[in-house]
Curated annotation (Swiss-Prot):
It is a multi-pass membrane protein. This is Potassium-transporting ATPase ATP-binding subunit. Belongs to the cation transport ATPase (P-type) (TC 3.A.3) family. Type IA subfamily. PANTHER family: POTASSIUM-TRANSPORTING ATPASE ATP-BINDING SUBUNIT. Residues 1-11 have a biased composition (Basic and acidic residues).
C-alpha cells in the first residue's frame, strides 16, 4: 500500500467531518447549491443589470435578435414621428412603452448574465499572480510557463497552472473551484493526478507537469463561459430564431399592405399605429426571452457545480435517449468492502487471507485496502508494506487484464475477475475448481462481487479461493430510474463485474440493461451502436481510458477529480465529482427545452387576442361590421391600441422569472408533456391577453383624451 497516501487520508479524517461517498452537495451546502447563490430578482442585482440593459441598445447587439431589432427600429420611428408632433400624447405614450419593451428584453438578458458575472468574480479572486519554481530550481512567473514544464509545489504554494502530478502526493485546497472546504488528495499516477491552477497545496510536495498555456487554464475557461463571452447560439436556438424572423417578415409584409387598403377605404393609418400593430403581432415575448432562457439554463448547471462547455451540450442533455451509468459511485455507494474469504477445499481461510492481502498491498482502491484490513482484523495478519518485499514485481490492475498481484519469494499471486484469473491459472497448467465456481455463483447471485485469488509456486498454479466484496445500491435509485423510463430514456449500467453480479445489481437498481465485464473498447462500441440507431448518449468518466468514450458521447460529463485528458474530452465537468449528478443534468437539459417550447407556444398564442384588440380599432369606423370583432368591448381605438402595447411590454417583465427559473419539470412521456404545455401555455397564451388587455383598457380609458 502507498503509505504516503494512507498517511494523508488518515490525517484528513481527523480534521474533517466524515461524509458519505459521493454526497449530492458539498459540505455545508444544500443539494443543488453552487459556489454562488443568487435570487431571481434581488434589488442589488436589478440595479447592477440596468446599465447593461441600456448598453445592449447598441444596434449591433440588438441585431442578434431579429424580433427585438424590429421593435428597436419601431421605437426609433415612433419617437421620430412624435417629435414632429410634440402635443401628441398618444404617440409619446406608445413610443415610451415600445422603448420599455426593448429595455425589459435587455434587462432579462442582463439579469441572466449578471448571475454569471457574480460567479466569474468569485473565480477571479481565485486567480493570483504566482511565481513558479521549475524542477531545475529556476523561478519563472506563472504566466511564463509553457506546456510540458515541470514545476515544484510545496505546502503553502498556489499551483501556477493546470497540470498532472508526476511525482509525490499532497492534499490540495480546491474550495475556490468547487466550494468544498475539505481538502482532496492529488497524487501521481491513476485517476487523481489532475490539478487546477489557482488551487493551494496544503501539505507535502508534488511535481506538476503543466498541460495548458497561460490564459487557457480551467479557471480562465470557466470565467469566459459563465460570463457568456464564449457562449454561442445552439442549433435549436438558431432554428427558433429563423422561425421567429420568418414570422416577423410575414407580419411586416401584412402590415405593409394595410395602408393601401386604408386609402381605398377612405381613411388614413398613422405610422405610429402601424408600428404598434406590427410590434403586437410579431412574437416579441419569446424573442425577448430567448437568450435569457439559454443563459439561465447554463446558470442552473453552474449553481449545481457543473460547468457546461457549450449551450449545445445542455440542449443535447435534454434530448438524451440513452444514459450510460458506471455502477460504482453512480448506482452503488462506490466503496465495495471485503466481507469474507471463501477458500476452496484443501485451503485454509488463513492461507487465502494471506495471499489476498499480499496481492492487495499495491492496490490503492478502497476495495484493495478493505482486503488488507479484513485479513488483519479477522485473521490477525499484520499489515505488511510494499517495501518489505525486496525484489518484488508488482502487477498493476488494467482494464484489459482485469487482475493484479505480485511476484515475490518464488511465487506469483494474482487477484481479480474470475474469468481472468482462471485463464491465468490454465495458461500455467492448472485448472479451476468446482468449489470456486460455486462460490462465485453464490456471491454474484446475491449482488456481491467475487474476486478470485490464485497462486503459482512449487506446487503449480491453482485457485485458492474467493474474496466476497459487497456492493450497496444507493437509496432512491430505483425511483429515479422509473422516472427516466417514463421520460423515454433507456438506462444502461456499465461495470467490470461478471454477468451474474451485474444482473443482480441491475435488477435491484431497476436499470433497463447492463454491460458486464466492460472494457473501454466495449463502452465505445456501445456508444457508437446507440448513436447509429439515432439516439443521443450521455455518460460520465474520470480516467484517461474514459477520454475516447467521453469525446464520442453526445453528453460527456468528466469528474473534476479525474485526469486532464478526461476533462478535455468531455463537454461538461462536474466540480463535485458526483457521477449520480448525470441524471440531474439530463433533467436540467429537458427543463431548458420545455421552457423554451412553453414560452414560444405562449408567445404565438397571445397574438390572437392582440389581433382582436387592434384590427377592429383600425377599421371599425370604416367597416362597422368589424366592430363585432371587438369582443373585449374596448372603450376606444386609441385605448385598444395602447392597451395592447402596454400588455405586450408588461408580459415580458412578468415572464422573466419563469424564463430564468424554468418551467416546472415533471418526469413524464413526451406526448403527455406536449399535451400539458399546449393546455397550460397554449390556452394560457390565448386567455391571459384577453384579461390583461381588458384590465389595462379600463385604466387607460380614464386618461383624458384617450378614453
Amino acid at each position: 500500500m502507498n503509505t504516503d497516501t494512507q498517511k494523508h487520508e488518515d490525517a484528513m479524517s481527523t480534521t474533517t467531518p466524515a461524509r458519505a461517498p459521493h454526497d449530492d452537495a458539498p459540505s455545508g451546502q444544500q443539494p443543488g447549491q453552487g459556489r454562488v447563490g443568487a435570487g431571481l430578482f434581488e434589488p442589488k442585482q436589478l440595479v447592477k443589470s440596468l446599465p447593461d440593459a441600456f448598453r445592449k441598445l447598441d444596434p449591433r447587439v440588438m441585431a442578434k435578435s431579429p424580433v427585438m431589432f424590429v421593435v428597436l427600429v419601431g421605437s426609433v420611428l415612433t419617437t421620430a414621428f412624435s417629435v414632429t408632433e410634440p402635443g401628441d400624447w398618444f404617440g409619446w405614450t406608445i413610443s415610451a412603452w415600445l422603448w420599455l419593451t426593448v429595455l425589459f428584453a435587455n434587462l432579462a438578458e442582463a439579469v441572466a448574465e449578471g448571475r454569471g458575472k457574480a460567479q466569474a468574480d468569485t473565480l477571479r479572486r481565485a486567480k493570483t499572480d504566482t511565481v513558479a519554481r521549475r524542477a531545475d530550481g529556476t523561478t519563472v512567473p506563472g504566466t511564463g510557463l509553457t506546456v510540458g514544464d515541470l514545476v515544484v509545489c510545496e505546502a503553502g504554494d498556489v499551483i501556477p497552472g493546470d497540470g498532472d502530478v508526476v511525482e509525490g502526493v499532497a492534499s490540495v485546497d480546491e474550495s475556490a473551484i468547487t466550494g468544498e472546504s475539505a481538502p482532496v488528495i492529488r497524487e501521481s499516477g491513476g485517476d487523481r493526478s489532475a490539478v487546477t491552477g489557482g488551487t493551494k497545496v496544503l501539505s507535502d510536495r508534488i511535481v506538476v507537469r503543466i498541460t495548458t498555456k497561460p490564459g487557457e487554464t480551467f479557471i480562465d475557461r470557466m470565467i469566459n463561459l459563465v460570463e457568456g463571452a464564449a457562449r454561442q447560439k445552439t442549433p435549436n436556438e438558431i432554428a427558433l430564431n429563423i422561425l421567429l424572423a420568418s414570422l416577423t417578415v410575414v407580419f411586416l409584409l401584412a402590415c405593409a399592405t394595410l395602408p393601401p387598403f386604408a386609402d381605398y377605404a377612405g381613411t388614413h393609418l398613422d405610422m405610429i399605429v402601424l408600428v404598434a400593430l406590427l410590434v403586437c403581432l410579431i412574437p416579441t415575448t419569446i424573442g425577448a426571452l430567448l437568450s435569457a432562457i439559454g443563459i439561465a439554463g447554463m446558470d442552473r448547471l453552474v449553481q449545481r457545480n457543473v460547468l457546461a462547455m457549450s449551450g449545445r451540450a445542455v440542449e443535447a442533455a435534454g434530448d438524451v435517449s440513452t444514459l450510460l451509468l458506471d455502477k460504482t459511485g453512480t448506482i452503488t455507494l462506490g466503496n465495495r468492502q471485503a466481507a469474507e474469504f471463501v477458500p476452496v477445499r484443501g485451503v485454509t481461510e488463513a492461507e487465502l487471507a494471506d495471499a489476498a492481502q499480499l496481492s492487495s498491498l499495491a492496490d490503492e482502491t478502497p476495495e484493495g485496502r478493505s482486503i488488507v484490513v479484513l485479513a488483519k482484523e479477522k485473521y490477525g495478519l499484520r499489515e505488511r508494506h510494499q517495501g518489505e518485499l525486496v525484489g518484488a514485481e508488482w502487477i498493476g490492475f488494467t482494464a484489459q487484464t482485469r487482475m493484479s498481484g505480485v511476484d515475490a519469494d518464488g511465487r506469483k499471486v494474482r487477484k481479480g475477475a474470475a474469468g481472468s484469473v482462471v485463464a491465468w491459472v490454465r495458461e500455467r497448467g492448472g485448472s479451476g475448481t468446482e468449489d470456486a465456481d460455486t462460490a462465485v455463483e453464490r456471491i454474484s447471485a446475491a449482488g456481491g462481487t467475487p474476486l478470485l485469488v490464485a497462486v503459482e509456486d512449487e506446487r503449480g498454479a491453482r485457485v485458492l479461493g474467493v474474496v466476497h466484496l459487497k456492493d450497496v445500491v444507493k437509496q432512491g435509485m430505483r425511483e429515479r430510474f422509473d422516472e427516466l423510463r417514463r421520460m423515454g430514456i433507456r438506462t444502461v449500467m456499465i461495470t467490470g463485474d461478471n454477468p451474474l453480479t451485474a444482473k443482480a445489481i441491475a435488477d435491484e437498481a431497476g436499470v433497463d440493461d447492463y454491460l458486464a465485464e466492460a472494457t473501454p473498447e466495449d463502452k465505445m462500441a456501445l456508444i457508437k451502436r446507440e448513436q447509429a440507431g439515432g439516439k443521443l448518449v450521455a455518460m460520465t468518466g474520470d480516467g484517461t481510458n474514459d477520454a475516447p468514450a467521453l469525446a464520442q458521447a453526445d453528453v460527456g460529463v468528466a469528474m473534476n477529480t479525474g485526469t486532464s485528458a478526461a476533462k478535455e474530452a468531455g463537454n461538461m465537468v462536474d466540480l463535485d465529482s458526483n457521477p449520480t449528478k448525470l441524471i440531474e443534468i439530463v433533467e436540467i437539459g429537458k427543463q431548458l427545452l420545455i421552457t423554451r417550447g412553453a414560452l414560444t407556444t405562449f408567445s404565438i398564442a397571445n397574438d390572437v387576442a392582440k389581433y382582436f384588440a387592434i384590427i377592429p380599432a383600425l377599421f371599425a369606423a370604416v367597416y362597422p361590421g368589424l366592430d363585432k370583432l371587438n369582443i373585449m368591448g374596448l372603450s376606444s381605438p386609441d385605448s385598444a391600441i395602447l392597451s395592447a402595447v402596454v400588455f405586450n411590454a408588461l408580459i415580458i417583465l412578468v415572464l422573466v422569472p419563469l424564463a430564468l427559473k424554468g418551467v416546472r419539470y415533471r418526469p413524464t412521456s413526451a406526448d403527455r408533456m406536449l399535451r400539458r404545455n399546449l393546455g397550460v401555455y397554449g390556452l394560457g397564451g390565448l386567455v391571459a391577453p384577453f384579461i390583461g388587455i381588458k384590465l389595462i383598457d379600463l385604466i387607460v380609458s380614464l386618461i383624458p383624451g384617450i378614453g
